């Protein structure tokens, strides 16, 4: 069974360019604004959307994404509403892949079987659950794969050749290479090391490898995209939302417009990546 992620990645491979994968926090700063951000992403140049599920204890996230999650929770965002957001987006876009990203606890409380059924019905294509190691694949990964949802695993600079096959064992859709250790939103890693790491991962899998953590500008997206199948941008997008919110959360400009402007520039960087690499 091929998913929207598989089809999108195959299409981009024939076009000879990497994917731009964009992360935003569902419900930040409120449901309607967040939905308008999501709807603006494909037109601005996003190839795959990562929809963040807010959680009260986001241990892998840096201050920007933590703050976005808290704003979303304060605004009343729940997993039910996040799935509803995906469903509303799907009503107008049946092509752009959606990956839910977050932590296992809200899914566990929701109920795995119910969650997978509702996620499929909402048009979800993949899951990134950062706190579920391969040793717990029976919990969610295997049921998700059986349901036809990609389970995307993270690899890091500390994932050595002994550990890598285990990490890749039930991974599908793409591999998400976290280009540094630590929390999201840290400084960009050395690009030469990133290229070597991508090649090392590709020695173990035929899956596309997308690189994230630290990409903020079109130039960074271009450089990373020259050696990867996809470039993931998250913190910069979350910051674009935060930057148009006042001290009490009031909007000083349109968050969807701010995000679209940023993503448009990133998309240009990604689209020029292979051209630059070929020169």
From Swiss-Prot:
Query: What does it do?
Result: The alpha subunit is responsible for the aldol cleavage of indoleglycerol phosphate to indole and glyceraldehyde 3-phosphate.
Q: What GO cellular component is one of the record's annotations?
A: cytosol
**CDD domains xref list:** Tryptophan_synthase_alpha
Q: What Gene3D superfamilies is this protein classified in?
A: Aldolase class I (3.20.20.70)
What catalytic reaction does the record list?
A: (1S,2R)-1-C-(indol-3-yl)glycerol 3-phosphate + L-serine = D-glyceraldehyde 3-phosphate + L-tryptophan + H2O
Query: Which catalytic residues are annotated?
Result: 50, 61
EC number per UniProt: 4.2.1.20
Q: What is the name listed in the Swiss-Prot or TrEMBL entry for this protein?
A: Tryptophan synthase alpha chain
Subunit details: Tetramer of two alpha and two beta chains.
Q: Which InterPro entries match?
A: Aldolase_TIM, RibuloseP-bd_barrel, Trp_synthase_alpha_AS, Trp_synthase_suA
Organism this protein belongs to? Mesorhizobium japonicum (strain LMG 29417 / CECT 9101 / MAFF 303099)
Q: What is the main EC category here?
A: lyase
Q: In which pathway does it act?
A: Amino-acid biosynthesis; L-tryptophan biosynthesis; L-tryptophan from chorismate: step 5/5
Its family? Belongs to the TrpA family.
Extract one GO molecular function annotation from the record: tryptophan synthase activity
Q: Which UniProt keywords apply?
A: Amino-acid biosynthesis, Aromatic amino acid biosynthesis, Lyase, Tryptophan biosynthesis
Which Pfam families does the UniProt entry name for this protein?
Answer: Trp_syntA
